[in-house]
C-alpha cells in the first residue's frame, strides 16, 4: 500500500463490515430538504439553496411549468453570485431598515425571505394589496393584446416588502440581481440611461480607482455605500440620483476616514446608528433623504491612511476643512 496507515485490515473492514444505502427522491425540493437534514456532520447547504427548496414547495400545482422554468433559471446562475446578492445586499438592507445587526447571512436568517403564500394564506387585510398587484400583473401580461404590442409589466418589487412565496420570490431575486449588477462596481458609470453630474461621476471614478480600495475595511465601506444607493434607487429611481451619490459618499466614507481600521462591526454600527436606512424607508420624497445632516471633518478627525484622493473630494465638497 502507498499509505501504510491504510492497510489490509482497513480494506477488509470496508468490504465486510460497512454498508452503502441509496435514497432516490424524485422531487427536487424534497431532495434539498432531506440532504440538509442528514448533512449535520458534513457541509451545510447554502442559505440560498434552502430558500430555493422552500419556495419551490410554495408553487401551486397549476404553475408546474413556471416552476420548472424557475429551477432552470436559478440553476443557470453561479452559486457564489447568488450568495453575494443575499449576503451582501438583500439581507443587510432588510436588517438595517429595522435597525437590526447584519454581520453574516446564515441558514438561521432565511426566515427573512419567507413570506406569504397568496394561494393558501387567510385573507387578512395586509395581504390584499399584494393580491391585487399579483393578479393585476398576471392579467396584464396574459392579455391577448400583449401578443400584438409585445409589452410586459414587471412586478413592482420593493426591497423591504413582504415576500410573496413561490414564483414571485424567484422573480424578485432575478430583479435585484440585475439591479445590483447595474448599480455597483464600475457599472453605474457606464449607464448611458442614467445621466449623472460631473461630481457624481468623479466620486464613482475615485471609488473605483483609489489605491487602498481593496483593503477589507474599505470593502466594507463600499458595501455601505452600495447598499444605501441600491435602497434609494429602489424607492426613488433616477430622481436626484447624483445628489444621493454625493450624500451617501460623505455618509459612508466619513466612517472610513475617521477610523484606524474598519471591521464588519464598524460597518454594521454605522449603518444602524446613523438611521439612514430607516430615513429612506420613511421618506416620501428624495428631499427628505438628502436633508440628512453630515459632519464636516478636520485634520484631527482623520485616522485612516492612504486616503488622500478621497480627502480631496471631501474638501472640494466642503466636508473637510484644514481648520475651523
Which residues make up each language-model segment?
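Flexible coil/loop and intrinsically disordered segments
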Residues: 1-324
